[in-house]
């Protein structure tokens, strides 16, 4: 599913630039994605669109987020720490944080891998038509193992 999401981010400027689900499914199949992976991604994107509509403007900039035990278990410490990092850097406002948490919680399975959370955050920016600044975009795309330490 995450490969499909990255493909959409790289090939469509905004969600409204994407064709309808049927045409998009055909295009994604033609590129080589599996039908189950495509269906999962499109369902997840529908949830993203709904979450974006329901969370915009509902949080104060001064609010403090307390994660429930189920959120802590599902997100994992690395993902929660990364969300906190983005918030403290001033690039992930509370409404976008809530959308990211909502979409991460929509995933099945155990703790969300940090790489997957980064794609989720990237897709939240994408869904709202916002481009993260270059440093944050680098943080979202580059693996820590690939970084060159000076």
UniProtKB/Swiss-Prot annotation:
Q: Which domain of life is it from?
A: Bacteria
Pfam families recorded = DUF494
Q: Which InterPro entries match?
A: Smg
Family of the protein in this entry: Belongs to the Smg family.
What protein name does the entry list? Answer: Protein Smg homolog
